[in-house]
């Protein structure tokens, strides 16, 4: 019988990806609960109302008004019927996000990378929101057009459309400058770029977290050292690794990173044990050689 050996670093990377997926689902559910906090109020009990309000008979006034206007009865009945058929879009959106979270966890278990899954999920969520929650830009234009005076419309009918378009363009430009860049463009240019770089660096470091690398010692020999001996969180190691020249560009392109150079960089600034063992002059030369070799590939 042949035995199958599983690399512990692969298990750690998979567990970290699953934790990130679970945290993402929890964050989405928490945001939905915060947005629906106004819908979770307790109902008002009739017994807790004052005595004067209890004595009011609402049915009489309502029946008289309905009898006087039979057309209102039909309109209200039709409106109530239409409102019953329409479901709350927030509830549909919450169920949609729950299904998205389940799909993310399933894809993570198959071995796909978290950033690839998350980028596709973001596009799906944005398209869903754009279809089911359209912006109300038409209402703003109608309100602005009604503010024009009738005198200008009568005297200068040809110039009013141009003025209105100029006003709308100015207000739109002012709104854009005040609110900053659009959410989609901002996320694709900055947030997703940083997240992809950090995810790639964390993935490669996690794969070789227990691998030992050779470093020159003070006693003209060598010693072995790995990322586990740093006793640091993976997030802190990633932040320090981004300050190494050339690492960010390599991670953005999905290329292999000089992990020994990163380990030497982080260890020389955050590990006293590493500082006591390593020969600083030879370490600088090795780190520079590793960077040149990986950048030239």
Swiss-Prot record:
Gene Ontology MF terms in the entry: RNA-directed RNA polymerase activity
Modification after translation, per record: Phosphorylated by host PKC and by an unknown kinase.
Ranges of compositional bias, category Polar residues: 136-162
Gene3D superfamilies: 6.10.140.1560, Phosphoprotein, C-terminal domain
SUPFAM superfamilies: Phosphoprotein M1, C-terminal domain
Positions carrying Phosphoserine: 63, 210, 271
Annotated Pfam families: PP_M1
BP-aspect Gene Ontology terms: symbiont-mediated suppression of host innate immune response; symbiont-mediated suppression of host JAK-STAT cascade via inhibition of STAT1 activity; symbiont-mediated suppression of host JAK-STAT cascade via inhibition of STAT2 activity; symbiont-mediated suppression of host type I interferon-mediated signaling pathway; viral transcription
One GO CC term on file: host cell nucleus
Phosphoprotein is among the record's keywords: yes
Short motif (Nuclear localization signal): ranges: 211-214
Self-association and partners: Homotrimer when phosphorylated. This trimer is stabilized by binding to the L protein. Binds soluble protein N, and ribonucleocapsid. Interacts with host STAT1, STAT2 and PML.
Function: Non catalytic polymerase cofactor and regulatory protein that plays a role in viral transcription and replication. Stabilizes the RNA polymerase L to the N-RNA template and binds the soluble protein N, preventing it from encapsidating non-genomic RNA. Also inhibits host IFN-alpha and IFN-beta signaling by binding and retaining phosphorylated STAT1 in the cytoplasm or by inhibiting the DNA binding of STAT1 in the nucleus.
Protein family: Belongs to the lyssavirus protein P family.
Protein name according to UniProt: Phosphoprotein
